[in-house]
Amino acid sequence: MGVRIMRKKALITGASRGIGAAAARMLAKTGYDLFLVCKSSEEEINIIKEETEETAGISCQTMLCDVSDPVQVELMAQKAGEVHILINNAAISHIGLMTDMSLKRWHQVIDTNLNSLFYICRLIVPQMVRRQSGKILNVSSVWGNVGASMEVAYSASKGGVNSFTRALAKELAPSDIQVNAVAFGVIDTDMNVGFSKEEMDELKKEIPADRIGSTQEAAEMICRILEAPSYFTGQVITMDGGWI
């Protein structure tokens, strides 16, 4: 009987579309098994499962999970099992005056974008510490670096992601676990659906690269960071076409 070689597994949240889906496809091509999570887009995430298993020959599990709910996250961690790479990508946005924002919506943004990192990492990190290896990549935003008018909750959540990344990296470096983040500028995802074509054209004029970034480029940056030497940790890398 042949010996089955255990492949490494990547857990990706917000994996049904956008940056998460692009990262899943790219990691599958490099031979990682996948555990893909999204809140409700079951059809979309199962398409990625079928595609990656067929084209890359890897194992891909999927699960619906609201990462803002610690009870659901516990079930997710149990089902995921061994995780070697964790990509915290799930996020929501809110555009509007801070004074018009409801308390419920504030908590939704903070719980999804920031608190979810704590809920997930507190369950996944112990196994990484036992193995003395692991990689955590948090998807952040330039608004976490400088803040954005009309996006106070989103900016605050991503600023928290940046600090969470730097602090956890110091905590886990002795266990040879890398923790990094990418602060993306404008990437071509569903987060832009609220903007008109005219608004997007004006936004592009502000970006020296004269365009918005693609999810493929975002995934390439994520994978390059995941391949970086183990001494590379605690970094928040900005990728924004020279914008901010």
Regions found by a protein language model. Name each.
Residues 126, 170-174:
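Alpha-helical segment proximal to the catalytic Tyr-Lys
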Residues 121, 157, 165:
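Active-site helix of classical SDR
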Residues 173, 178, 232-234:
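Short, small/polar-rich loop/turn modules that mediate ligand/substrate recognition or access, typified
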Residues 133, 211-239:
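C-terminal substrate-recognition "lid" of short-chain dehydrogenase/reductases
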Residues 16-17:
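Conserved glycine-rich cofactor-binding loop
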Residues 97-98, 105-110, 199, 203:
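Substrate-binding pocket helix/loop in short-chain dehydrogenase/reductase
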Residues 141:
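Residue(s) in the substrate-gating loop at a strand-loop-helix junction
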